[in-house]
């Protein structure tokens, strides 16, 4: 958007044709930073109060993030490069694309500058069309090596899939570079959980013996436990069948659900991995139905054919058998893929869905308004964490004020009291996990994922 069109927008604001909030949202959606929007308003004679981001409902760096970190748009020290790596292909295109848009929005809100450096960003795609957009190990390794060999690169924002993180973390760790994820939830990346993580985890991912990895979303030991407690205690489900897509993430969260459901007193009639490349699950569902479960839990991501699993489940079992899945299914692609079979499905998520953020209002609601205007559709649930991940990185660069991987990593690990778009604050623990434990429960209603309530273990 040109400065001339901004002036037109300001004129509409003064004439009453456009409200101040709409002006801020439209200008931000066009890619202008908070500073440029404020400058344009002041140049047009709008008061300083009206020009402030808070007055317009725009969530700038000042309204979220760790306290006491000053921001400057000076770029005299040179350039810092930021990379991300997650799927941007096939069924994952919308999910990954929404996260990239959130990263770019956060960068724009900081004026594409931090700590005296100009910021550049490159989004890498670790997905492959042949795998329905799912990540590929060779690409993940190539991306990690590309990043550590770029002298301007200070931080890698990666990955979406926990299995991909297993590959990238050791490469970044050996190079002493920070890696931060907006979506990894497998516990074993940061901590050992009895019965749910592999032998040697997480230490085997950190060859230097020092931590370099963080995540801003709650891990699956929290999500799986909350899911089991809700199913058993609140829904009265006593007999579960547990499926997973045989990925690190899917098997991990399904195992936590299984273990916690049994600890509650529930019966697990069976637990197995399904073939994500199969074209039909009728025989599987017929065999499961014969065991008379009252709930089927499916640990999977959308690119691993869970929509077909649900369709075939519904063709064999009635609606009285509850379907429950984790955050890997909390996206429009899953609902669209399953079609009518998705109605009534329950899905958990480590946070709040976009509809809940809008209901809460404040910076989170404004974020949803802005990113929706940018995308032309409601964002993927995880996209909000893409924004927060970026703010963590930018504030660390501000604190370090040097082009130094070690100092930026140290600053990131010390993030505390971070004001979240979800409301409240969170801090990183010594393992690099967020101490936030918000788990949201959603239900598919009329083809849309609708927030129901917050749950806990």
Regions found by a protein language model. Name each.
Residues 1-22, 29-36, 44-46:
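N-terminal secretory signal peptides
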Residues 17, 39-78:
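C-terminal segment of N-terminal export signals and the immediately downstream linker at the start
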Residues 63-104, 124-135, 160-161, 243-251, ...:
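Extracytoplasmic "Venus flytrap"
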Residues 64, 68, 153-271, 324, ...:
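Extracytoplasmic ligand/sensor domains, especially the bilobed periplasmic-binding protein
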Residues 68, 94-99, 112-200, 216, ...:
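Beta-alpha junction/loop-to-helix N-cap segments that form part of ligand/metal-binding clefts
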Residues 84, 147-160, 178-183, 241-244, ...:
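Periplasmic-binding protein-like
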Residues 310-387, 445-456:
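Extracellular/periplasmic periplasmic-binding protein-like sensory domains
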Residues 370-383, 392-451:
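Segments of small-molecule ligand-sensing domains
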